[in-house]
């Protein structure tokens, strides 16, 4: 499982889980330094991307199917083949997540056919964006594949920068990739961060966001298109491309029914909350395909805060754990508060299992939370092998789910 992360926080796709490397008090949120507030906004942006873009839906299906394979007793080769296919394409569309050398300076960008994917899956006929950078001689350069992951991180950085005075990043992978690509390919469009943010947001509505981003940018240059508003960009894209938030509610519900099976605990509020986040994502996209950028386009900073707070209020907040092991959530359905605590258990178990579903020796991922909360179910075994926790003074959710999944 790959996290989306920067130096101060991370977001775990599909599991709707935010982790911050700082202590944060949401009762006094605005009293924190801009860097702390910006980090939260950055990771929260990934949550919005997860529940309102094709990129997020693809991550949910891929990662959750992989998790379900790990916990199944009956594992067959057919399931593994399907999982490998989905994961290969998901990883391909996501592109590279790190590079060998920073800072990076773009030398050339090209869209090419991927021969490796074609060899593995004949007839797939997929394009990829290759970015050559830090060129020293004619044939000596570094390169990376530009895909959804770079776009998601670039967008999240632009969002946090639009709301708070965070540290400026320059030529830093992956946060400045979309900015630098726009400067290299269409400098006139790169003059406005909001325009770049909007193109990022619209690109994440496509399966193959990388090639779409480049093709759309090239078309804008060809047409000498210079927007005056975010709405102009949305209308331009709608004129030449058919894009939208693609996903299947039935698939999400089917996956969740296995992650949270029927038992003596009622998981229906959690499942309903997750499904309704995607439904809200669809509703926001119907209002505007780039509603995040639209909410931040005003030059009035208070208007940006107000609109962003409306989005947060509507979507709520997934489980968030800070550096001190304190965890926060903000979920409700029909004005009734929903407890998301059980969502931590599948996430923890996923980290404790390898791709074959075998236990990886090590501490429980929730140990800091239990230590901070002085949880009665916590014991020293949690630091070595949480399966051997013999403390009977409390109910350990990880151990409970472990038994429910019938894991060894």
Region locations from a protein language model:
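Non-catalytic terminal regions of proteins
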Residues: 1-55, 64-65, 169, 173-408
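Active-site-adjacent bridging/hinge elements
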Residues: 17-18, 120-136
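Post-HEXXH active-site segment of zinc metalloproteases
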Residues: 30-34, 50-92, 134-138
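Short, solvent-exposed segments of well-ordered alpha helices
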Residues: 31, 35, 143-150
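Low-complexity, serine/threonine/proline-enriched polar segments
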Residues: 70-123, 313
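A long, hydrophobic alpha-helical segment
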Residues: 128-144, 165-166
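An active-site-proximal "capping" alpha-helix that borders the catalytic cofactor pocket
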Residues: 149-164
């Amino acid at each position: 499982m790959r996290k989306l992360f920067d130096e101060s926080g991370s977001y775990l796709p599909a599991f709707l889980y935010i982790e911050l490397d700082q202590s944060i008090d949401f009762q006094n949120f605005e009293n924190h330094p801009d860097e702390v507030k910006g980090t939260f906004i950055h990771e929260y942006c990934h949550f919005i991307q997860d529940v309102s873009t094709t990129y997020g839906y693809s991550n949910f299906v891929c990662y959750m199917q992989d998790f379900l394979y790990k916990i199944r007793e009956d594992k067959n080769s057919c399931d593994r083949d399907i999982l490998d296919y989905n994961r290969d394409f998901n990883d391909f569309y996501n592109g590279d997540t790190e590079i060998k050398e920073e800072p990076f300076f773009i030398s050339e960008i090209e869209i090419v056919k991927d021969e490796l994917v074609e060899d593995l899956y004949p007839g797939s006929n997929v394009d990829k964006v290759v970015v050559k950078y830090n060129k020293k001689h004619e044939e000596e350069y570094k390169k990376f594949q530009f895909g959804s992951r770079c776009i998601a991180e670039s967008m999240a950085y632009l969002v946090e920068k639009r709301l708070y005075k965070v540290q400026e990043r320059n030529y830093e992978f992956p946060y400045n990739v979309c900015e630098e690509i726009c400067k290299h390919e269409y400098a006139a469009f790169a003059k406005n961060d909001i325009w770049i943010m909007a193109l990022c947001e619209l690109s994440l509505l496509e399966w193959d966001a990388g090639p779409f981003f480049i093709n759309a940018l090239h078309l804008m240059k060809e047409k000498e298109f210079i927007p005056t508003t975010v709405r102009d960009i949305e209308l331009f894209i709608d004129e030449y491309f058919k894009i939208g938030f693609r996903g299947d509610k039935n698939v999400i519900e089917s996956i969740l029914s296995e992650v949270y099976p029927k038992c003596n605990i009622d998981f229906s509020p959690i499942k309903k909350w997750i499904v309704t986040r995607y439904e809200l994502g669809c509703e926001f996209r119907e209002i505007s395909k780039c509603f995040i950028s639209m909410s931040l386009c005003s030059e009035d900073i208070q208007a940006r805060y107000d609109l962003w707070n409306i989005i947060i209020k509507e979507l709520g907040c997934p489980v968030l754990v800070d550096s001190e092991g304190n965890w926060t959530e903000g979920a409700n359905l029909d004005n009734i508060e929903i407890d998301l605590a059980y969502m931590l258990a599948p996430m923890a178990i996923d980290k404790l299992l390898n791709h074959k579903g075998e236990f990886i020796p090590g501490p429980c991922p929730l140990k800091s939370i239990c230590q901070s909360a002085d949880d009665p179910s916590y014991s020293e075994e949690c630091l070595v092998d949480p399966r051997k926790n013999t403390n009977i003074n409390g109910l350990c959710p990880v151990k409970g789910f472990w038994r429910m999944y019938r894991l060894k």
